[in-house]
């Protein structure tokens, strides 16, 4: 399997992301989420970034 095939296989799989343990106190650290997120191929346009 090459990198392209691997990437295509993973498009249909859910992934984990880092989430804060306590969103009101980020010093409590982070934990991995359940397998709930889909891989996104969204890439914002540089023109859409705020320059302020």
From Swiss-Prot:
Reading the lineage from the top rank, the first entry is Eukaryota
Q: Which InterPro entries match?
A: DUF5354
A Pfam short name: DUF5354
Protein name per its UniProtKB record: Uncharacterized protein C02B8.7
Native organism is Caenorhabditis elegans
